[in-house]
């Protein structure tokens, strides 16, 4: 019950086709692919900068320290 079977995915695909039509689906897929590609390039660009990620100072706020 927790996972989606192939039938669930087919029903979702059918609803998407009915809502958007077959003409718009390639454009939506292309836009989604470009978004994922841009995200991956941005993540790789951040890693190539050579700067280590900033560390959190680990401050303790008085309200949090009393609640433990």
From Swiss-Prot:
It comes from Chromobacterium violaceum (strain ATCC 12472 / DSM 30191 / JCM 1249 / CCUG 213 / NBRC 12614 / NCIMB 9131 / NCTC 9757 / MK). It comes from the Bacteria. The Tat system comprises two distinct complexes: a TatABC complex, containing multiple copies of TatA, TatB and TatC subunits, and a separate TatA complex, containing only TatA subunits. Substrates initially bind to the TatABC complex, which probably triggers association of the separate TatA complex to form the active translocon. GO terms for molecular function: protein transmembrane transporter activity. It is found in: Cell inner membrane. It is a single-pass membrane protein. Gene3D superfamilies: 1.20.5.3310. The keyword Chaperone does not apply. Part of the twin-arginine translocation (Tat) system that transports large folded proteins containing a characteristic twin-arginine motif in their signal peptide across membranes. TatA could form the protein-conducting channel of the Tat system. The chain crosses the membrane at residues 1-21. This is Sec-independent protein translocase protein TatA. Disulfide bonds: none annotated. GO terms for cellular component: TAT protein transport complex. Residues 56-68 have a biased composition (Basic and acidic residues). Residues 42-68 are annotated as: Disordered. Belongs to the TatA/E family. Keywords: Cell inner membrane, Cell membrane, Membrane, Protein transport, Translocation, Transmembrane, Transmembrane helix, Transport. The gene is tatA. The keyword Protein transport applies.
């Amino acid at each position: 019950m927790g996972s989606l079977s192939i039938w669930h995915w087919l029903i979702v695909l059918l609803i998407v086709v009915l809502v958007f039509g077959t003409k718009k689906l390639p454009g939506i897929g292309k836009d989604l692919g470009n978004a994922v590609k841009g995200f991956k390039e941005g993540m790789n660009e951040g890693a190539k900068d050579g700067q280590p990620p900033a560390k959190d100072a680990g401050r303790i706020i008085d309200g949090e320290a009393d609640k433990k």
